[in-house]
Amino acid sequence: MPKIFRSLYVQVLIAIVLGILVGFLFPSFGEGLKPLGDGFIKLIKMLIAPIIFATVVSGIAHMRDTKKVGRVGGKALIYFEVVTTFALVIGLVVANILKPGHGMNVNPATLDTSAISKYTQAAGEQSVADFLLHIIPNTLVSAFTEGDLLQVLLISVLFGFALTQLGTLGQKVLAGIEAVNSAVFVILGFVMRLAPIGAFGAMAFTIGKYGVGTLAQLAYLMVAFYATCLLFVFVVLGLIARFAGFSILKFIRFIKEELLLVLGTSSSESALPRLITKLEYAGANRSVVGLVVPAGYSFNLDGTSIYLTMATLFIAQATNTHLSLGQQLGILGVLLLTSKGAAGVTGSGFITLAATLSAVGHVPVAGLALILGIDRFMSEARALTNFVGNGVATLVIARSEKALDTNRLQRVLNGEVLPPATPEVAAEERGEGRGLDGPLPA
């Protein structure tokens, strides 16, 4: 086999193209390939809980200074809130300028709401108190068996703090956890070999079930959304990255394999373990990566934030529902809260949108039926934007903590293949971060 075809990047790219062709030419057959994509994502999700647990626990235990843990967590939450607010505002502004729903003149009473009933029902059941209580698992084990990211994160933080109080015994327990984590990453390497199959099945199903022709009527919204996500990544995140001392273009090239995996599966979670590995390899301190990345997957959903404001205004425009500036700002305020409630919920984007429309009362909830058919096609842009945003956030916060080896980062982003980063003790003596404990997987 030629060397180029051994690259995961090339294999996934070929799989995506083949999936599109199969779904287009043989729709029924393509729709039947859904288990391939679902199976691959389930294999990845099977590993996410133990990886996040070990990564967060290791990060907190290695910091030892509880004040530093609080400082990093505080910086992360402030960063997430500011950047996601920017994303919400950008979506609002673009939707007002482009008016993707203008001229559709849809009567909400004529829409079939049966397909969206499960989303509106879930939205009505999710209050703020329910969301906060949901973070607390019923048992220590249930968080892992259910794969709830927020619950795993809570247990991991508590466990990490507990180990810092156990002295020598805590170090022994930590060594065992890190050994298990190493084994999990070996399993991840096995699973990643199946990535092209998963991407092929997921893409064939998407095109086979929804088709390309059905997108024509709503194509303007999709194009506007994709363009807005690109604008956000290259302008907003690009400026943030430049301020932090690295190029967004080089960073995207560095994570290109992971981005293709996200594109093929429409799930940013599918590449979460590899993002952790690559950020450590690039010179970010393990303790910062372990705290920021899992938290970002729950609270730093830039792509989802853009989607929420654009979809809300699209429905209002399509149903001829006039929204004053005050009402739009009110929707923005509600979204600042409800967008955080999307964390760890299956179908989170649609449920959060339904919750927002129900809360504000100005926009007909029945309008959700307009975008249900194309929501699956917009999920790729949401997932890609969320993924890049979390990578940038981690590097920015690591640099602010002097936990980033900037020289190593530049060399890695310039395409150099480096050995594992220097040992942690030597890195801490220089005030720099530490990299990966092993070679970067292909």
From Swiss-Prot:
Q: Name one GO biological process term.
A: L-aspartate transmembrane transport
Keywords annotated in UniProt: Cell membrane, Membrane, Symport, Transmembrane, Transmembrane helix, Transport
In terms of PROSITE patterns, this protein maps to: NA_DICARBOXYL_SYMP_1, NA_DICARBOXYL_SYMP_2
Answer yes or no on keyword Transport.
yes
Kindly give the PANTHER family that the UniProt entry links to this protein. AEROBIC C4-DICARBOXYLATE TRANSPORT PROTEIN (PTHR42865:SF1), PROTON/GLUTAMATE-ASPARTATE SYMPORTER (PTHR42865)
Q: How does it sit in the membrane?
A: Multi-pass membrane protein
Could you say which protein family the record assigns here?
Belongs to the dicarboxylate/amino acid:cation symporter (DAACS) (TC 2.A.23) family.
Q: What does this protein do?
A: Responsible for the transport of dicarboxylates such as succinate, fumarate, and malate across the membrane.
Under NCBIfam families, the record lists: PRK01663.1 (NF002461), PRK13027.1 (NF009587)
> Which gene underlies this protein?
dctA
- Keyword presence, Transport: yes
Spell out the residue ranges making up region: Disordered: 420-442
Recorded protein name is: C4-dicarboxylate transport protein
Cited Gene3D superfamilies: Sodium:dicarboxylate symporter
Where it sits in the cell: the answer is: Cell membrane
Naming one, the record's GO cellular component terms include: plasma membrane
Q: Highest lineage ranks of the organism?
A: Bacteria, Thermotogati, Deinococcota, Deinococci, Deinococcales
Please give the organism: Deinococcus geothermalis (strain DSM 11300 / CIP 105573 / AG-3a)
Residues passing through the membrane, by range: 10-30, 40-60, 77-97, 149-169, 185-205, 221-241, 288-308, 354-374
Stored InterPro entries: C4_dicarb_transport, Na-dicarboxylate_symporter, Na-dicarboxylate_symporter_CS, Na:dicarbo_symporter_sf
